[in-house]
Amino acid sequence: MLILTRRVGETLMIGDEVTVTVLGVKGNQVRIGVNAPKEVSVHREEIYQRIQSEKTGSPEGGNY
């Protein structure tokens, strides 16, 4: 895992077309902005996992 330090307003690049910008820090929460082409899906991890479990039909954690 690559670990980077960024300040508010600073950006990092992922490949040539994806940027991640630190928008703000409040306590232990960080607000980030992601710019990516429409064909690149961007999800929070818990949402991505739910999408994947719905695709396979295996409910996660018994919440269904």
Swiss-Prot record:
Q: Which domain of life is it from?
A: Bacteria
Instruction: State if Isomerase is listed as a keyword.
Output: no
Q: Where is this chain's protein located in or outside the cell?
A: Cytoplasm
Any one Gene Ontology biological process term? mRNA catabolic process
Q: Does the keyword Transferase apply?
A: no
Q: Which GO terms describe its cellular component?
A: cytosol
Q: Which UniProt keywords apply?
A: Activator, Cytoplasm, Repressor, RNA-binding, Translation regulation
Q: Which InterPro entries match?
A: CsrA, CsrA_sf
State a single Pfam family of this protein: CsrA
Any one GO MF annotation of this record? mRNA 5'-UTR binding
Q: How does it assemble?
A: Homodimer; the beta-strands of each monomer intercalate to form a hydrophobic core, while the alpha-helices form wings that extend away from the core.
What is known about what this protein does? A key translational regulator that binds mRNA to regulate translation initiation and/or mRNA stability. Mediates global changes in gene expression, shifting from rapid growth to stress survival by linking envelope stress, the stringent response and the catabolite repression systems. Usually binds in the 5'-UTR; binding at or near the Shine-Dalgarno sequence prevents ribosome-binding, repressing translation, binding elsewhere in the 5'-UTR can activate translation and/or stabilize the mRNA. Its function is antagonized by small RNA(s).
What does the sequence similarity comment in the record state about its family?
A: Belongs to the CsrA/RsmA family.
Tell me the protein's name.
Translational regulator CsrA
State the organism of origin: Shewanella amazonensis (strain ATCC BAA-1098 / SB2B)
Q: Which gene encodes it?
A: csrA
